[in-house]
Curated annotation (Swiss-Prot):
Family listed: Belongs to the NPC2 family.
GO-annotated biological processes: sterol transport
Database matches in InterPro entries: Ig_E-set, ML_dom, NPC2-like
Pfam families, sorted: E1_DerP2_DerF2
Function noted in UniProt: Binds human IgE in vitro, and may neutralize IgE antibodies present in blood from repeatedly tick-bitten people. Does not have antimicrobial activity against E.coli or M.luteus.
Record keywords, A-Z: Disulfide bond, Secreted, Signal
Gene Ontology CC annotations of this record: extracellular space
Name the UniProt record assigns to this protein: Mite group 2 allergen-like Ixo r 2
Keyword Signal (UniProt): yes
Length: 144
């Protein structure tokens, strides 16, 4: 009984750290099914400087493509800046390429939270294939 209770407490603690992100679509004709972020326990998600964030995306591809590129940007002082330290080539171990139109893909990416000033801002994630933009999502975040 005690082991079962400990197991439930651990599962509960871990699951509280992963949350479906509130996002708005921003283009592309692919289907963005879900975006989950960890660690995140609020809306908007609050990230600590110098830590890593894991983003889980489920999407349906709208095009056949030999490539899949991630373009992640964060708004700083009104300018869209690339998120530093991320792998932009999703075919390098994240997505099985070539991408096939109509197939569902689950992508997990790890992003370092830069040690910038504290701010509330917007992050934009785009997945781009050979024929252009496939999916795009925007979400508010807080960096502390």
């Amino acid at each position: 009984m005690f082991r079962y209770l400990v197991f439930l407490l651990i599962v509960g603690a871990v699951s509280c750290q992963r949350r479906k992100a509130v996002y708005k679509p921003c283009g592309g004709s692919g289907k963005l099914i879900s975006v989950e972020v960890e660690p995140c326990d609020s809306d908007p998600c609050v990230f600590k400087k110098g830590t890593d964030v894991k983003v889980h995306v489920t999407m349906v591809a709208d095009q056949d493509s030999d490539t899949a590129t991630l373009d992640a940007r964060v708004k700083v002082f009104g300018f869209q800046m690339p998120v530093p330290g991320i792998e932009t080539d999703l075919c390098k171990g994240t997505v099985e390429c070539p991408v096939i139109k109509g197939r569902k893909y689950s992508v997990t990416a790890i992003f370092p939270v830069p040690s910038l000033m504290s701010l509330k801002t917007e992050v934009t994630f785009k997945v781009i294939g050979d024929k252009g933009l496939s999916v795009c999502g925007q979400s508010d975040i807080v960096i502390e």
